[in-house]
Amino acid sequence: MLELRPNCELCDTDLPPEAADARICSYECTFCAACVEDVLRDVCPNCGGGFQPRPIRPRTAWRDGTGLGHDPPSQRRRNTPYSGEEISAFVAGVRDVPVTER
């Protein structure tokens, strides 16, 4: 089950389940679109992968066993352990490699 993390791991802005600006990598690291575009340049600082829009989980259980009531978002806030300098250096070394070749 996709973990819906509650915040951007870089700037700590809230990203509720319905946030259209939430971005995730293949490991579910979660960042806001502004950080992905302006700071991270589509490079996850944790794994080096790229980002995609996070799916929005339906509020309503349209089918049994689905929806936010059945699979609620995480309450655990996460923050990247890397400094701004570490992130900048990492991004600079990875961003020119196509996502499909990382």
Give a label for each model feature.
Residues M1-R102:
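Intrinsically disordered, low-complexity regulatory regions in eukaryotic proteins
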